[in-house]
Each structure stands twice: as C-alpha cells, then as structure tokens.
UniProtKB/Swiss-Prot annotation:
PANTHER family: FLAGELLAR L-RING PROTEIN. A lipid is attached at C22 (S-diacylglycerol cysteine). One of its GO terms (molecular function) is cytoskeletal motor activity. One of its GO terms (biological process) is bacterial-type flagellum-dependent cell motility. The gene is flgH. Disulfide bonds: none annotated. Belongs to the FlgH family. Assembles around the rod to form the L-ring and probably protects the motor/basal body from shearing forces during rotation. This is Flagellar L-ring protein.
Amino acid sequence: MQKYALHAYPVMALMVATLTGCAWIPAKPLVQGATTAQPIPGPVPVANGSIFQSAQPINYGYQPLFEDRRPRNIGDTLTIVLQENVSASKSSSANASRDGKTSFGFDTVPRYLQGLFGNSRADMEASGGNSFNGKGGANASNTFSGTLTVTVDQVLANGNLHVVGEKQIAINQGTEFIRFSGVVNPRTISGSNSVPSTQVADARIEYVGNGYLNEAQNMGWLQRFFLNLSPM
C-alpha cells in the first residue's frame, strides 16, 4: 500500500499541472517589444584638415535659431493626449412568414376505392404555414482620457515618427501599466509638443494592472477548466 501511494503522488501532481495548463489562458499584450528608445550616437568625424567636414557629429543640444523643438530624431519625446471616446450600437430584426393551401377532389371514384372513401366523391385538402421572427442588438462604449509621454523609436522613410511609451503607477499592492504605440505625422504636432491620440495612426493603447485586485477579477483555473468542459 505504501508503494502504491508513492507512485500515486507523481500522477496526481501531473494531473494538477495538466489541468492548470489547460485552463490558463495567457494574455498577449497589445504593445510588444521595448517601450523606450535611446538616441543613436553619430559617427566620429575624421580630421582631414579642411573647414568642411563631410561627417558632422550629431549634437542633440544644438538648435538653430528658426527651428522649433518638435521631435525628429530617435530618442526624442512627445506627449500623447489620450482622447478616446468610441461608441457603437447595432440592431437588426427579421420577419418571415409563409402560408399555403391546396385542395382537390374527384367527382367519381373507382368501384374498388368506394369502400375507402365511402361515397362517389373524394375531397382532399392540404394546408401549411411557417413563420419566423428574429431580433438582435448590441451596444458598446469606450472612454479613455489622460496624457502619456512617449519616445520616438523609429523614423520612417516618409518622415513619420513611430512612437512607443509606457507609464507605471504603483498603488498599494498593485501596479497599473499604461502602454502606447503608433505612428505620428510631424505636421500634427502642436507647439506644445503634443498630439491627440485621435490623430495617431495604428494606435495601440493598453491599460492593464497586476496585483491581488487584478487576480480577483480573473476566474480560478479549476473553475475555468470545468467551464470549458461544460456543454452549457
């Protein structure tokens, strides 16, 4: 009996691990990869004894007199003003009906069928009907407001800027993560170095958290396992 119990423990542990793996659904983040970028160092100039140098070092602190401070290089920062307000509604209905009726008769019936019909005339009638009613509707709304400063991590060939950023806020025993990525047209950047999120292409906005509050909102692995097996 003791030998059997020793062999049963690994089997039970394997079953628990299998159930856990089947019931756990991994969450795939919308914003993947690094959430920041560092400026690229410029090439080292080669002294050739001439006033004109073909390769000039990149001086990020230098600014021409008539040039604004809009981001244009990798590592520059930009403020995204989150102004997402999306609502959608949909309703549909369908009605269908169909009725049919057919009747016919015989004035004379063959002699060998008179016992079946009981007289010299046979009347037959058939009718049928079908009806269908269906209705459906759905409503959804989403509101997101705030600000987030992101970093330029790629300058596209047409001059657009691909930006990415993350903000972490620790509250009690949980941490809130706000992640953003998208493509910004430099012409839409205001003088305060900000752009609304509604003017960002391919925007990915993610607001998630971890901690015991987030875990309380998730279904347990055993309950999720039986929910997947239930036919209801």
